[in-house]
Amino acid sequence: VREVAKKGTVLVGFHEKRSSFIADMKSCEILPKRVSDLLVPLRELINSLSLRKKLPQIELAVTDEALALVLRVLEKLTADDEAKLRQFQKDYGVDFWYQPKGPDSIYPMDPENAARLKLHHRETGVEVVFRPTDFTQVNHRLNEVMVTRALRLLHLEPSSKVIDFFCGLGNFTLPLATRSAKVLGIEGSTELVDRARAGAKDNNLADKTEFEARNLFDWTLDDWDAVWNKLGGVDRVL
């Protein structure tokens, strides 16, 4: 996002090739159509805000049910600015999130919209709630295919005990748990582990899953022994 005084407007788009300039875009063929169709209204909205010079970036996340736009705001919004954002949110069916500092500082303008972004795995009925800045596969249908493929390749049985390394939010862990006796998800981030546990609870899989925060780049034979003893053996590893 950049205000261009000579053009009397705000540009919203990607950087030009090998440049810090923002491309003057009114549509984008590689974005979902409903996002592409928002480029012009979004430009008009931001151009009307008092903090348009303090809004350098927008991130987005899209699912079939929701479209979240994360505004990188460098100063507090005025009441008038927030009213305009709320009206835009209502008119175009988007969910605005604010990011005042680093990626972990994001929060939704309306708290009730915090759980609207979800990854679905229809075969197992698992839903994984994620935030707009979380790492997920950009193609959610392909993500679902990948999870299903993993279920097939692992040849899971009701007695299987599985370890899922770099489990993140439990995108694979939770579907695996629907076909196994126990799945241990291991992830480097304590925050992601906490959220994976919450996801297991939401999907009624807390009794079939465990999550641990560990530095997987320092994994040793002693760690293998520890998880082996904890699970009473390991049948599958992902």
Where would I find each of the regions flagged by the language model?
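Rossmann-like S-adenosyl-L-methionine
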Residues: 76-238
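Carbohydrate-binding surface patches
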Residues: 61, 66-74
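Extended interfacial segments that mediate partner engagement and assembly in macromolecular machines
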Residues: 1-51, 55
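Peripheral terminal and linker regions in Fe-S/redox and tRNA-modifying enzymes
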Residues: 1, 41, 45-48, 66, ...
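Short small-residue beta-strand/loop micro-motif enriched in glycine and branched aliphatics
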Residues: 20-26, 67-70, 130
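Short strand-connecting beta-turns/loops that link adjacent beta-strands
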Residues: 5-8, 63-65, 124
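Secondary-structure transition/turn motif
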Residues: 14-18, 71-76
